[in-house]
Amino acid sequence: PGATRPQYGGTLRVELRQNAETPDPPALLGGGFTIARWEAGRLAVYEADENAGGGRPFLGSVEFHLGRALRDQASDLDLGKADVVELGPGELRRQPAGRRVWSSSPVRVLALVFAPRYEDARVREALALAVDRSAIHTVLLQRQGEISGALLPQWLSGYAFLFPAAADLGRARQLAPGARPITLGVSDAAARPIAERIALNARDAGLVVSVTPQTANADVVLAELRIASADPAKALAQIAEALGLPAPPREASPNTAPNAAANASPEQAYAAERALLEGFRVIPLIHLPDVYGVGARVKGGPGIAPSGEWRFDNLWLEGARP
């Protein structure tokens, strides 16, 4: 019976892929912890706050180890060197029966993003129509997430289903003649099989696409963008900024408040997103959840909110020593 009673103390070890480009430490919801150490892109350590408003959390501290490959994370979880690790589709498939898995709502969008210099709108549209999202979702992603032609996920906007996501090879073949070869950059090795599948789809439409790990000079990049706000208009503006696209249009009038974007109606938000997607400079493919494998000594939880943010105030470690 004592094993299930919350215990104080112990260090929760979390491993993530986030790398040296990450400027800020992971955000924690719910309070209860203060950051004690931050080595940018490598390590973040949080200590329990004895004076937390909601009471001291059970965990003594939390360590985030960043820049860890998915395969290494899975190995560390199996060996008991980590308590919480990210799971890609391949790792999720290999999880032993009975292991707990935490999953958020779809909070990342996988998309093809063309370089500003790539001017041929017909070829951009041809590639958009050639991609077989369904095969990628079923085979490569093990049905994780949701197929979509929208930047914002359905749970957030309510209108994602209005953007077409079906392949149309016939139309793609009509647009493809005369297209020069395209380079598709993918920096994340875990996403390379998806890029290779897109190249195969493109070939079926008469396009020549070669996959490269170099993204700087690629014609188009397979990118992953995080939905960073629960407000549709704000989330859309942040995605546009991250992609270097013009800010989404909004109704302008002398009385427009500075935060008018945050108060946009669903119709305005839909129109703004449609404007961003016109011209096929960005081609949304699939919305993905954050998925984590959890070690046996972790109790309580889940430790993530539907928004994907961390929440450790209701976790404890079995066998922890205060």
Predicted regions and their residues:
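Short, well-ordered beta-strand elements
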Residues: 10-17, 31-35, 44-45, 60-66, ...
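Bilobed "Venus flytrap"/periplasmic-binding protein-like clamshell domains
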Residues: 18-22, 30-54, 169-175, 181-198
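Short, solvent-exposed loop/beta-turn-alpha elements that line the ligand-binding surface or hinge
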Residues: 3-4, 16, 21-38, 54-58, ...
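Alpha-helical secondary-structure segments
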Residues: 11-16, 61, 79, 106-149, ...
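Ligand/substrate-recognition segments at binding pockets and active sites
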Residues: 173-228
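Ligand-site clamp/hinge motif
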Residues: 51-94
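Paired acidic/hydrophobic, glycine-rich loop segments that form the ligand-binding mouth/hinge
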Residues: 82-89, 219-224, 284
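Structural transition elements
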Residues: 142, 146-178, 186-193
